[in-house]
């Protein structure tokens, strides 16, 4: 039977991608249905209890700048906040927070249940309704059919998921949850390339059985950072420390002596695991010269005794896991409350997607999260927001939108996936971005909030706060530009006390702030340049914009040159065999990838600059050279 009301957008899956997709589509005024196998696990942190980190924190800030949910949720649930790379330049600084799993899930569910235009329904999905290469709905486990103009798949590790502990394995979407086997079979019937990936998680430890007195503590930062541009530290719950222990030679001997019982090394697992989050058995074998590995003992929440030992993800048998855990300092009497495991699951080649995350082959079908080959809550949330946005726009008969590589880490993520694909779980790093000086955490709102407003994602409150911040930045920069001090002025002595070389000529506030030794806080503590801005976000922008002005201008020039290629469009139906002068290898790769632009084509492995030149000349001769606005 069909449900009585049709929807504009259906989201299948209630993890980090699905919840962002649902919130986004509903926020844009589209009637949205979120289908989940269990309402109680909406926003569940399946693996580590943390949000953010290098590259990942940048994505969270971008999601927030576009009106998304993740930053607000972690501000309400974070039990330890830190700035990573704090001593380095602003481009690579990143926020990270330990999370209370229960509080995080509560924050997400509360937001979903209070979002207008959004209905949540608990039922596993087993089939899609596809008519003439267009998705028009979904079918649940009990045969109930829902109609919609667009469907977003955010199914995580559930597609034909298989859990491995030692040489034993069983079907599961994650520990304690069933897999989605009928939907996996249905998707394999569609003209989509599918493969398998693997990820893993460590055993969870009972905190009452750990001797914390012999371990080093790691505290959060003070003052506490916040994730959301709309947030403040008063929203944070109680803050707690993490603890540090290490593996040792005894640990490594246990692992080496039991490799024959590892499903990875015994050849039972076929899926490829994450390169940058390897299992402890992988670390011991790949880095044989290391006699120890640092392990962070992270609390799972304020009301839980569970500890997440970050760094010992494993699929070894339970008895071996016990030996590994008890070989480490402070853990000699530790008890495991949940065994670690590896999970294999289906993912679909993201090269079969448009940059909007819509399938190239099934109109109206969008993919986001681990189904696209990524790993991590933050990568999933960013894709979920983009897929939800474009599903909503499609249902409203509007053109899709995707950010450029020069505009956002989300743009880098999507371009990497859609252009290059992935053979292993993809995670974000700052090193993946060519323009990382422009793509900082601190300016995510300056880069994206105006566009978010145009797209209908940014509410009036955020928009007013954003414009106030812009005005504060502009007013303060003008004030510093027009405030001068001369070497002979009474205030010069106070200024010189903060400089490595004294003033030799008249200088403005901006001139002084450009000096490496002068901070904004120091400058505005001087009588001549007081008072400081009360808006801390605006003050940070003033300092960064002034100090890095030359570098930022140079990078902006590079971006403008590159945009010429990015905006030169390639016809979706072009058969590259028609283009004389291209090698067979280049023709095969271009026909396989079907790049949307010259810029995207230039990033495909094996497509040379010479091939790009040939292609541009051919397009011009054919009168097919056109650029997007």
Swiss-Prot record:
Q: Which organism is it from?
A: Salmonella paratyphi C (strain RKS4594)
Q: Where in the cell is it found?
A: Cytoplasm
Entry cofactors: FAD
Keyword Flavoprotein: yes or no? yes
Q: How does it assemble?
A: Homodimer. Heterotetramer of two MnmE and two MnmG subunits.
InterPro entries hit by this protein: FAD/NAD-bd_sf, GIDA_C_N, MnmG, MnmG-rel, MnmG-rel_CS, MnmG_C, MnmG_C_subdom, MnmG_C_subdom_sf
Q: What is its main location?
A: cytoplasm
Report any one BP term from Gene Ontology: tRNA wobble uridine modification
Q: What is this protein called?
A: tRNA uridine 5-carboxymethylaminomethyl modification enzyme MnmG
**Could you tell me the keywords of this UniProt record?**
Cytoplasm, FAD, Flavoprotein, NAD, tRNA processing
Q: What does this protein do?
A: NAD-binding protein involved in the addition of a carboxymethylaminomethyl (cmnm) group at the wobble position (U34) of certain tRNAs, forming tRNA-cmnm(5)s(2)U34.
Q: Name one GO molecular function term.
A: flavin adenine dinucleotide binding
Cellular component per GO? cytosol
- Residues engaged in binding NAD(+): 273-287
């Amino acid at each position: 039977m069909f449900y009585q009301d049709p929807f504009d957008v259906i989201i299948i899956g209630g993890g980090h991608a699905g919840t962002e997709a649902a919130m986004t589509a509903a926020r844009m005024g589209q009637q949205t249905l979120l289908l989940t196998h269990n309402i109680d696990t909406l926003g569940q942190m399946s693996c580590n209890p943390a949000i953010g980190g290098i590259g990942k924190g940048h994505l969270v800030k971008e999601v927030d700048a576009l009106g998304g949910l993740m930053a607000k949720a972690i501000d309400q649930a974070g039990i330890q906040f830190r700035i990573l790379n704090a001593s380095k330049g602003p481009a690579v600084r990143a926020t990270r927070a330990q999370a209370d799993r229960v509080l995080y899930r509560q924050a997400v569910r509360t937001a979903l249940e209070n979002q207008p235009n959004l209905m949540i329904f608990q039922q596993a999905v087993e089939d899609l309704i596809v008519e003439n290469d267009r998705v028009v709905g979904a079918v649940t486990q009990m045969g109930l059919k829902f109609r919609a103009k667009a469907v977003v798949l955010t199914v995580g590790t559930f597609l034909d998921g298989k859990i491995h502990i030692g040489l034993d394995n069983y079907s599961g979407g994650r520990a304690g949850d069933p897999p989605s086997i009928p939907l996996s079979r249905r998707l394999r019937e569609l003209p989509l390339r599918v493969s398998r990936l693997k990820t893993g998680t460590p055993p969870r430890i009972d905190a009452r059985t750990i001797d914390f007195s012999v371990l080093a503590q790691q505290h959060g930062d003070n003052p506490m950072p916040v994730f959301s541009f709309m947030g403040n530290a008063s929203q944070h719950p109680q803050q707690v420390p993490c603890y540090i222990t290490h593996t040792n030679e005894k640990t490594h001997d246990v692992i080496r002596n039991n490799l024959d019982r590892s499903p990875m090394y015994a050849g039972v697992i076929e899926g490829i695991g994450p390169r940058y989050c390897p299992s402890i058995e992988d670390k011991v074998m790949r880095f044989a010269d290391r006699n120890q590995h640092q392990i962070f003992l992270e609390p799972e929440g304020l009301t839980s005794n569970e500890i997440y030992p970050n760094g010992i993800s494993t699929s070894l048998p339970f008895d071996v896991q016990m030996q590994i855990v008890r070989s480490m300092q402070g853990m000699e009497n530790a008890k495991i409350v949940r065994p670690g495991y590896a999970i294999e699951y289906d993912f679909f080649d993201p090269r079969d997607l448009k940059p909007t995350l819509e399938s190239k082959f099934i109109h109206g079908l969008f993919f986001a999260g681990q189904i696209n080959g990524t790993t991590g809550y933050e990568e999933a949330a960013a894709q979920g927001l983009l897929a939800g946005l474009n599903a909503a726009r499609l249902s409203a008969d509007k053109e899709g939108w995707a950010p450029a590589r020069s505009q956002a880490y989300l743009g880098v993520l999507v371009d990497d996936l859609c252009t290059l694909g992935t053979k292993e779980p993809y995670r974000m790093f700052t090193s993946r971005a060519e323009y990382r000086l422009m793509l900082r955490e601190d300016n995510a709102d300056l880069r994206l909030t105006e566009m978010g407003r145009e797209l209908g994602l940014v509410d009036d409150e955020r928009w007013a706060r954003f414009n106030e911040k812009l005005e504060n930045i502009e007013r303060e920069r003008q004030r510093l530009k027009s405030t001068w001090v001369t070497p002979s002025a009474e205030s010069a002595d106070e200024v010189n006390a903060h400089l490595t070389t004294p003033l030799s000529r008249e200088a403005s506030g901006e001139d002084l702030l450009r000096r490496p030794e002068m901070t904004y806080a120091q400058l505005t503590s001087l009588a001549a340049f007081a008072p400081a801005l009360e808006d801390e976000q605006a003050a940070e922008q003033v300092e960064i914009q002034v100090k890095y002005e030359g570098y930022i201008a140079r990078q902006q020039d590079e971006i403008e040159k590159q945009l010429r290629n990015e905006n030169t469009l390639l016809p979706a139906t072009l058969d590259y065999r028609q283009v004389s002068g291209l090698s067979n290898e280049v023709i095969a790769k271009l026909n396989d990838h079907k790049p949307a632009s010259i810029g995207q084509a230039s990033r495909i492995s094996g497509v040379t600059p010479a091939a790009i030149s040939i292609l541009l000349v051919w397009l011009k001769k054919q009168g097919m050279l056109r650029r997007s606005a």
